[in-house]
Amino acid sequence: MTEDEDFIAQAFERVRREAQRRNGRVPDLNNRDAFRRTTPRPIGDRANGGNGGGGGVDKRRRGRPTGPDGRYKPYVRSAEPLGAILNREIRSRGWSRDIAAGWVTSHWAELVGPKIAQHTKVEMIKDKKLFITCDSTAWATNLRMMQKQILQVIAEKVGPDVIAELRIFGPQAPSWRKGPLHVKGRGPRDTYG
């Protein structure tokens, strides 16, 4: 044996003694499983070479956990999907009807079709009543005739208790008022000849 080999053997022997002092297990370099991570032995296990003092392995682990090969374990994310969280909050706060009503307002063209949506406008929703204004009196009349079908489509899409009634209005009559001040007049006159 040369001097270098003897020095290496002495250093390895010191490492083995220190390892035995700390946790009692010394890896066997000839064994393939020597580099696998093992679970720490309890402090003070005298039967397997522990010293019973405070030199054992602390059971608390710090940092990121690793697998048997020493690589970091992937983080396990157990977060709920965002949709599930939102649905739970909407139900718990009682917003289901309000959100359904908002959906009716924003998807009006999808509910009644593009042609009708072009000539109508949803003004507001109040107490299960949908207020709609139309471009002309003819469109208001047609929409009143289609009221039952529109309510059925709304009930299919958002639920039966969201909208119960449609209030359909024609266009606003022209106002002859000009300026901020007004004196009550004698009513409309025959101004069209």
From Swiss-Prot:
Annotated segments matching region Disordered: 17-74
Domain of life: Bacteria
Signal peptide per UniProt: none
Pfam families recorded: DciA
Listed InterPro entries: DciA-like, UPF0232_actinobac
Skewed-composition ranges (Gly residues): 47-56
Family: Belongs to the UPF0232 family.
HAMAP family with a match to the protein in the record: UPF0232
Protein name: UPF0232 protein CE0005
Organism encoding this protein: Corynebacterium efficiens (strain DSM 44549 / YS-314 / AJ 12310 / JCM 11189 / NBRC 100395)
High-level lineage: Bacteria, Bacillati, Actinomycetota, Actinomycetes, Mycobacteriales
